[in-house]
Amino acid sequence: MWGPLIYALLGLAIVAAAFLFVRRSQAKEVVPVADDDDKENGAAADEVNPRQAGDQGHTDDEDGEEGNEGLKNFMYDENGKKLGVKKARKLQEKEERRRRNEEMAQAREQAKLLQHQEEEERKEREAEEAEDERQREAELEREREAQRQKELEEYNSLKSMFVVEESGELDVDHEAQAQSLLNEFVSFIKEKKVVQLEDLAAHFGLKTQDTIERIQQLEAEGRLTGLTDDRGKYIFISEEELSEVVKFIERRGRITIAELMDNSNRLISLSETDVEFPGDEPAPADVDETTTA
């Protein structure tokens, strides 16, 4: 009973084996055989991108992510293994942060250097200004000291000219007293207008030569203006009279000394004013000795 069934199965197996043999033979005829040019092109392609050809750890999912991101250049680790897109992006962002931090650190350092330089320049300017100010103050102090010394010398010169008739010198205890005496000397000349130098010297207890020197010094200081004639009289000229003389010369243009002298009596008062010397006793009045019965 099993005999016919066994023969049938064997027949089917033979038919299947023959079918597979025919299919394999057809597949060999379809696959082209690579020629020498194709082999050279394949070898060149392997040399151009050996990492991509030998990269077996790269998955299809990572290839899809790289294609979606549009990355043109792949990143590799220190072992030459190609990195995934996510990891490569993280490394790239980390590198960018590091570069930005370095740039910011350099900018801060440059700002600190610039600030330090500006601070040093400011200190130098302040030191120069302080030195200039110190020199100006020192110069002003020297000028003030020179002025004080000059005034002291003038005062001592004034004081030395006044003498007392009895002892030959005046003991001045205070500057105010000497200044008061000097003012009295100037005022008397101005009020007297024309004064005999000998009388002036005798009244103030001075020598005639000291009186002349004192008047010359006062003229140099601008406190007196006048002239001394050949009779030993000093004629004080006021500012108003000087102004009149200047106007006269300007009106006349060129003028000779003779013309000026001829008009001096009109321009300058030469009359002596009746002013009593301080401390002088008034002259006794004339007494009529005639008596009436």
Swiss-Prot record:
Biased composition (Basic and acidic residues): 90-126, 133-151
Keyword Metal-binding in record: no
Span list, region Disordered: 30-151, 273-293
A Pfam match: DDRGK
Subcellular location: Endoplasmic reticulum membrane
Membrane-spanning residues: 7-27
Main location: endoplasmic reticulum
GO cellular component: endoplasmic reticulum membrane
Family listed: Belongs to the DDRGK1 family.
Stated role: Substrate adapter for ufmylation, the covalent attachment of the ubiquitin-like modifier UFM1 to substrate proteins.
Name of this chain's protein: DDRGK domain-containing protein 1
Organism listed in the record: Monosiga brevicollis
